[in-house]
Swiss-Prot record:
Stored SUPFAM superfamilies: Glutathione synthetase ATP-binding domain-like
Residues annotated as binding Mg(2+) 2: E260, N262
UniProt source species: Pseudomonas fluorescens (strain ATCC BAA-477 / NRRL B-23932 / Pf-5)
Binding site for Mn(2+) 2: E260, N262
Top-rank taxon: Bacteria
Protein name: Probable alpha-L-glutamate ligase
Named cofactor requirement(s): Mg(2+); Mn(2+)
Binding residues for Mg(2+) 1: D248, E260
């Protein structure tokens, strides 16, 4: 197969591993810089051009679209879909998962466990918003944040009011969530491919920190997940419409709670921690499921 990898940087661990795994299995792997691809949309034959030449003959595309280029990246991916190229994750699903609020609303509608979450626009509603999530301590998250940036733990209601007011003053969209103390600064990253959780790791925040992101100095270790956690991760990925996803789960006193569903999960942490060939499993998934015009939305956007 001829497989495109949409990635800004061919030297990134995840991109390198996907290219290696695909090449080992006999595929032609081509890394395409997402922002350098440009499109002819209105022609009778949809096309993508790259460095002066049309991109042609691709069987599948693996999107590794960073949060900062979601809009343009999804447009390029959608164009691949219009050309009948099989996407590992569809543009519709990626756009859906990048909207944190929309994601939580969809997961909530399907009865998937979530931390109590509040969202408001007016500063006048802050006291009631804090009450709604069971008061302090609570967590405030900027909707556009990634890798733990823009996430604040407020120990008191007074501190929470000040932080929420500050974010609102900066015209930042934020959500307020209950703090799950019993999780102890740890979460579980479940790596979903197709209809299986193929690997899982526990991420523990460093001492004095509550954000467990590996980018924030958290440490990763092997973990055995429960059947309920496995089912929660699979259901969350399915609700978002993602074939490959990193589902972040907290262990709470009332069962597993989904924090986030990541449509472009990094491979380095999970491969290093579990010793599994995750990139190879992803390529196998494409071999089994890929084919011309195989998007679930049938390229309708």
């Amino acid at each position: 197969m001829k497989i495109a990898v949409l990635s800004r940087n061919p030297r990134l661990y995840s991109t390198r591993r996907l290219v290696e795994a695909g090449t080992e299995r006999g595929h032609e792997m081509v890394v395409v810089d997402t922002l350098r691809a440009y499109m002819n949309i209105a022609s009778h034959k949809p096309q993508i051009h790259y460095r002066g030449k049309p991109l042609e003959g691709f069987d599948a595309v693996i999107p590794r679209i960073g949060a900062s280029v979601t809009f343009y990246g999804c447009a390029v991916l959608r164009q691949f879909e219009m050309m009948g190229v099989f996407p590992l994750n569809e543009s519709v699903a990626i756009a859906r998962s990048r909207d944190k609020l929309r994601s939580l609303q969809l997961l909530s509608r399907r009865g998937i466990g979530l931390p109590v979450t509040g969202f408001a626009h007016s500063p006048d509603d802050i006291p009631d918003l804090i009450e709604m999530v069971n008061g302090a301590p609570l967590v405030i998250k900027v909707l556009e944040g990634t890798q733990g940036i823009g996430v604040v733990l407020c120990e008191t209601a007074t501190a929470a009011e000040s932080v929420i007011e500050a974010f609102m003053g900066l015209k930042q969209n934020i959500m307020v969530q209950e703090y799950i103390k019993e999780a102890g600064g740890a979460d579980i990253r479940c790596f979903v491919v197709g209809d299986k959780v193929i690997a899982a790791m526990k991420r523990q925040a460093k001492p004095g920190e509550f954000r467990s992101n590996l980018h924030r100095g958290g440490s990763a270790s092997l973990i055995k997940i429960t059947p309920e956690e496995r089912m929660t991760a699979l259901r969350a990925a399915k609700v978002m419409g993602l074939s490959v996803a990193g589902v972040d789960i907290l262990r709470s006193n009332h069962g597993p709670l989904v924090m986030e569903v990541n449509s472009s999960p990094g491979l380095e942490g999970i491969e290093t921690t579990t010793g599994k060939n995750v990139a190879g499993i992803i390529i196998e998934h494409i071999e089994k499921n890929g084919g011309p015009n195989m998007t679930r939305t049938k390229g309708k956007g």
